[in-house]
A protein has these predicted regions:
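Core catalytic lobe of class I
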Residues: 1-198
Length: 198
């Protein structure tokens, strides 16, 4: 049994496989997207390492996430070009995809500066195990929340604590056990503690 308020270091696939079934209330995570990203900006690239294991859509964790989550759900960050891969994997794992939430970052991000539109959103797939009812008022599927500023980043694709707080409060009740198999900068852990979750 996993202890509340615990950080486990190790390979996420191995740790998930070793966890008990139906042991967490919600999985909220930002897995590698499979885009092999590293910033082209010299000052950012020199501070932040390339994202590990980010060459192909990393979906294998989803099957064990579906196994360990109770009658709750999974919130999975993704981006437009690999979104369908994650949706298909969530469905194959037996989860029901309920929504794709759009996170408006309020400023554009990485990408081809001259050959594509400036990306200013990320998608968050919300999938559930069994019949699951949101605990409060029905939230919108659009969340506007400023991204973490470049000078404050400690991870190349860091998520703001405020955004994670909104997601946690919309999908769980105080005391819920949250699992983030790809903790990155630890934003999910901080948001869980700030909202009275474990």
């Amino acid at each position: 049994m996993i202890q509340a308020n615990t950080v486990i270091t190790g390979d996420s696939l191995t740790v998930l496989r070793d966890m008990e079934a139906d042991s967490v209330d919600m999985v909220i995570t930002d897995p590698p997207y499979g885009i092999d990203y590293q910033s082209g900006r010299k000052e950012k690239a020199s501070r932040l390492a390339k994202i590990a294991n980010d060459k192909t859509p990393f979906i294998w964790w989803i099957y064990d996430a579906a196994r360990v989550v109770k009658r709750g759900g999974v919130l999975c960050f993704t981006r437009w070009d690999v979104q369908q891969v994650f949706i298909d994997a969530l469905r194959l794992a037996g989860l029901t995809v309920k929504s794709v939430i759009v996170w408006d970052k309020k400023a554009h991000g990485m990408g081809d500066l001259k050959g594509s539109f400036a990306p200013r959103y990320e998608a968050i797939i919300f999938a559930t195990k069994g019949r699951y009812e949101l605990p409060g008022k029905r939230p919108d599927d659009l969340i506007a929340c400023a991204k973490v500023g470049n000078q404050s980043l400690i991870h190349p694709n860091e998520k703001p604590v405020e955004l994670l707080e909104q997601l946690i409060e919309a999908t769980t009740t105080p005391g819920a056990l949250i699992l983030d198999p790809f903790a990155g900068s630890g934003s999910t852990l901080v948001a869980a503690a700030k909202t009275g979750r474990q």
